[in-house]
Amino acid sequence: MERILIIDDDITFALMLKTWLSKKGFRTETAASVAAARTALAEGGFSLVLSDMRLPDEDGIALLQWMSGQHMEIPVIVMTSYAEIQNAVRCM
């Protein structure tokens, strides 16, 4: 069973996504900050990360850079309600 990390400080949205993915057969964990996400990712075992772009302690770009520095080759989908081309380019 695939394991997915959901990173979002909007707890309602994160729990909705967690519930939906769990019903589809995925194992999920949530983190509400980049710091909590780093701790979870360091434990390993994730096959996908779904991350909000703007988090309370750092942004999703900082997390992507940290993951790259740790040589983590986990697919990441960055989510945001701020539809700006600049954000999409920064994530690439």
PLM regions and their residue ranges:
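His-Asp phosphorelay/catalytic-motif detector in bacterial-type signaling
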Residues: 45-47, 70-75
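Two-component/phosphorelay signaling modules centered on CheY-like receiver
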Residues: 11-29
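Conserved acidic carboxylate
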Residues: 8
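Acidic, metal-coordinating helix/loop segments flanking the phosphotransfer/catalytic sites
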Residues: 30-48
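Short amphipathic alpha-helix used as the core "switch/output" element in two-component signaling
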Residues: 39, 61-73, 90
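Short, conserved "switch-loop" micro-motifs in signal-transduction and mechanochemical regulators
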Residues: 70, 82-83
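Active-site residues of response regulator receiver
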Residues: 52, 80
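Acidic catalytic/metal-coordinating carboxylates
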Residues: 32-33, 59-62
